[in-house]
Amino acid sequence: MILNDLGVVDYAAAFSLQERIADGVYRNATPETLLLLEHHPVYTIGRAGCEENILDHSIQAIRISRGGDVTFHGPGQLVGYPLINLRPRGCDLRHYLRFLEELLISVVADFGVSAFRVPGKTGVWTDQGKLAAIGVGVRHWVTMHGFAMNVNNDLSSFERINPCGIATCPIASLERLCGCPIAMDEVKSRVAGRFQGLLDEWLPAAGAL
């Protein structure tokens, strides 16, 4: 597994990189990879998305191939794009989604935050609102897209959309929940440290001991 911390990058550049890595993973020419990054401000619209859920068009909106509806990405939000071959791991996309939720729930617990799933909705939630959005796509059973967790970002841009198609969806950030400054590098470190072990626990590869 390769970890690549990209810093703050444009959405289009990150998507192009995902495509190249996913193709390499499919051909067994590239190791599975976790990209961690932040985006410049952008709205993304998933396959189930409706442009009417964007209430303000001052920020670029891009329609993409992940599942889900509309969400916002910007600095201070940790985005993770795992490029994982699910074929030797059982081709179980729903279980993969639950793995991503468990990863983030376990990470924020390190900061004293109690997060949880909501039945029938993909993502990570807290008593104060939704903390992380999750939307994935697959090509030849190689995953693309991933998760976006609010760490220390300005949440006002979420007020100009119906996030994930939910008109009254409150949005939380790790920093607001903790009531103190949270360093992005610390969150990245905890995500990176847990990712491989939890992936192998939830989705063990065929033949793995």
Swiss-Prot record:
Gene Ontology cellular component terms for the protein in this record: cytoplasm
Organism: Pelobacter propionicus (strain DSM 2379 / NBRC 103807 / OttBd1)
Enzyme class: transferase
Lineage, uppermost ranks: Bacteria, Pseudomonadati, Thermodesulfobacteriota, Desulfuromonadia, Desulfuromonadales
Protein's pathway: Protein modification; protein lipoylation via endogenous pathway; protein N(6)-(lipoyl)lysine from octanoyl-[acyl-carrier-protein]: step 1/2
PROSITE patterns membership: BPL_LPL_CATALYTIC, LIPB
Catalytic activity field: octanoyl-[ACP] + L-lysyl-[protein] = N(6)-octanoyl-L-lysyl-[protein] + holo-[ACP] + H(+)
Taxonomic superkingdom: Bacteria
Protein known as: Octanoyltransferase
